[in-house]
Amino acid sequence: MVLDFFNNLKIVINFIQYMKNYKIKNKFFKYTMNLIGNKGLGKSFLGESVKKYLVKHCKTNDIIVNGYKMFLDEKDVMHFSLFDYEPIETEIVKTNVKKNDIVVDVGANIGYYTLLMAKNHASVFSYEPEPQNFDLLKKNVILNNFSSNVKLYNKAVSNFNGYSKLVLSDHSTGQHKLEKNRFGTKSIDVEVTKLELDKIDFAKIDVEGAELLVLQGMKTLPNKMLI
C-alpha cells in the first residue's frame, strides 16, 4: 500500500514537471485530471493539491465536455474535467429530447444541458439569473453554433413575475439560490418570471430546492422532466 502511494506520487510529480516545462493544451490538462481520478487520488490531500495547481497555473480558454467546447468558470474546471459529467442525467436528456421538441433549461448555469438539448435540434428556452454564469452560457451557445435554436434569458424562474434576491454561493456557481427575504449574505437582485409556454415537451429544472415553485408557475406542465 505504501509502495502504491509512492508510485502514484511519482507519476503525479512527473506530470507536474512536464507542465512546468511545456505550454498546456486541453488534452494534456484533461488527461492529467483523469489520471488523478483513476489512480484514486482525486479526494486525497495530494490529489486536491495537484488539481488546485493545475487550475491555477495550467488554465485553458476552453475544454471539451462530452463533445462540446465550453468556457468554464474557474470553480467548475475540476468538476467538469475530472470525470464524465453526470452520465445518468446526460443519457436521460439524449434519450428524451427529440428533433423539433420545445424544451426548457431552468437553472442553465453555463449551458451544458442547453448544448445537449440543442444538438438534438430542439427549440431550447434557457434561463440563468446569475450574470457571470449567463455570460458563459451565451458564449458557449455561440461557440457551438446553436444560436439559431436557443433562446437565452438572464432571469430566474419561479411562480411569480417580478424581482427577488439571488443568494450567491462561495463554493460553486451551480449553488446560487433564490430567496425573497435574505439579508446579511452576498446576494444580487434578479428578474424572476413564470414559464408561460403553451407547450413543453421536456424540462430540465435545477434550482437548488425550488423546483416545486417553478412547476407551480408553469402555464402547462412538461410531458417529461429531469429534476
Task: Show the residue positions of the predicted features.
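Beta-strand secondary-structure signal
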Residues: D62, F71, Y163-K165, D189, ...
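S-adenosyl-L-methionine
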Residues: V2-V192, E196
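Hydrophobic packing residues within well-ordered alpha-helices of enzyme cores
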Residues: M117, L137, V150, L166, ...
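Conserved acidic-Pro-Pro-aromatic motif
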Residues: T60, D101-I102, T114, N120-A122, ...
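Short, glycine/acidic-enriched loop or turn micro-motifs at the edges of active sites
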Residues: A108-I110, P131, V157-N159, V207-G209
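Short, well-ordered alpha-helical scaffold segments within catalytic/effector domains
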Residues: E86-K94, T185, D189-V192, L212-L215
